[in-house]
């Protein structure tokens, strides 16, 4: 059964899963770089306190199945402007649907309270483009070989009835 986790920099199992993922897929992720920086500079208590009060958001979520990370997303954003970017790890196999895209988008909009979620992907990653568009992202165009996508929180429209 596939499960969703928030990557905990102080959970040795999470770190081992992430290191195994990087080795298996021969990739370097923002997630490992970020948590190692946290572990080297803050105690767990300092980290928890900082997270409560920080304007900046830097965290990773991942799906795990059968003791391995299946997919990984690094989230970087700012609480005051309620905007974030999602960075997905490259997956070597051709994934037709990327379940973590929906989960990460919902997490950013509903759990973190973001208004705008951006994803930047390479121009040649057609599968990711299809997944983003199927998830309701708007293609904002190409910049320096990358395609920028945006999904905004749907604001409930208040209709005024004239009586």
Located regions from the model:
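A short gly/proline-enriched turn/hairpin at secondary-structure junctions
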Residues: 27-37
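Acetyl-CoA-dependent GNAT
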Residues: 39-83
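A conserved beta-turn-beta hairpin within the catalytic core of GNAT-like acetyltransferases
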Residues: 76-87, 113-115, 143-147
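Conserved acetyl-CoA-binding loop-helix of GNAT-fold acetyltransferases
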Residues: 93-110, 130, 134
